[in-house]
């Protein structure tokens, strides 16, 4: 069956994000790609990586397809069963939210499953829901699957953040140096917000790590409510806060019998990573796959010869799998 997708934009006035601690907008655009086929279709949520937005996912360039062009091509080739693709905006002024609720950033899980889901289901007839994402979005896909099994029935995790000691620890020194240079968390964030070139090496690594701390180890006693998992003077780990990071690491989540049972009940659990990932996420994917095998949890694990960036072509593999699995 050959068909095409339309692109619609909803305005979501989020009660979950109203009054969030960063002062970020609570009124957001929700981009939805809708198949021009009547009937009830599964909903596939596509979560961008750190610093990403729906605009990034949709953007075309001469050498890479945006998501709308990609799903139209897959549909025309007969590779994609009709599905509704939902692209939520979970960006924050620190660069992201990790798609979870945190008192330091805002209630982004609640935003997804209360505000955005309600808006989509009020407009279209939706079947089962699945989540796909890359990098931080891949992490968010797994986290939301185990925390919201009432909604999520299938997952595709592309180079998702996991095995945190490999993907995060190496970035702690850059944040510690930035805090020393600017005099603490609040002055650093003020300087970052004033910077004209925010994606430069001077800013990107430290603000990304600070954002992770805001998501994983919020602390109301700390500046901006962000608990640092290390001593900024010595880089010595603060075990209590670092353990809070590890508590949401997917390779640890699967050790919880409740989460293992949830993952085992999914219609699809697809995991991949490039063999040359700069954040070492292939190792986390291997560890997760090994633990899933040991627990007898059905999953698909693939590797491919590439690095971390510029791998959106892997959605050619996962989206057809998701759209088929969610119809079972």
Give short role names for the model-derived ranges.
Residues 1-328:
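Non-catalytic cap/lid and distal C-terminal segments of serine-dependent acyl enzymes
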């Amino acid at each position: 069956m050959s068909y095409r997708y339309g692109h619609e934009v909803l305005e979501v006035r989020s009660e979950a994000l109203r009054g969030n601690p960063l002062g970020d907008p609570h009124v957001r655009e929700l981009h939805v790609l809708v198949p021009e086929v009547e009937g009830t279709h599964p909903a596939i949520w596509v979560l961008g990586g750190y610093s990403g937005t729906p605009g990034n996912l949709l953007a075309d360039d001469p050498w890479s397809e945006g998501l709308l062009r990609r799903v139209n091509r897959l549909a025309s080739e007969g590779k994609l069963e009709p599905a509704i693709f939902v692209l939520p905006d979970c960006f924050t002024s620190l660069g992201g939210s990790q798609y979870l609720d945190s008192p330091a950033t805002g209630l982004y899980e609640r935003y997804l499953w209360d505000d955005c889901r309600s808006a989509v289901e009020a407009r279209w007839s939706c079947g089962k829901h699945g989540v796909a994402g890359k990098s931080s979005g891949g992490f968010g896909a797994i986290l939301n699957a185990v925390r919201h099994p009432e909604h999520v029935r299938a997952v595709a995790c592309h180079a998702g953040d996991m095995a945190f000691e490999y993907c995060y620890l190496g970035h702690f020194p850059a944040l510690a140096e930035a805090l020393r240079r600017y005099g603490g968390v609040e002055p650093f964030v003020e300087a970052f917000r004033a910077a004209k070139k925010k994606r430069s090496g001077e800013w990107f690594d430290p603000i990304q790590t600070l954002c992770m701390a805001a998501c994983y180890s919020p602390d109301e006693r700390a500046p901006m409510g962000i608990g640092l998992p290390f001593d900024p003077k010595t880089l010595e780990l603060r075990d209590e806060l670092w353990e809070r990071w590890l508590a949401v690491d997917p390779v640890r989540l699967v050790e919880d019998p409740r989460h293992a049972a949830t993952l085992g009940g999914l219609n699809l659990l697809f995991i991949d990573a490039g063999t040359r990932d700069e954040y070492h996420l292939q190792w986390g994917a291997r560890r997760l796959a090994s633990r899933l095998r040991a627990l007898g949890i059905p999953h698909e694990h693939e590797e491919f010869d590439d690095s971390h960036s510029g791998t959106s072509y892997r959605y050619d593999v996962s989206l057809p799998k998701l759209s088929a699995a969610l119809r079972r």
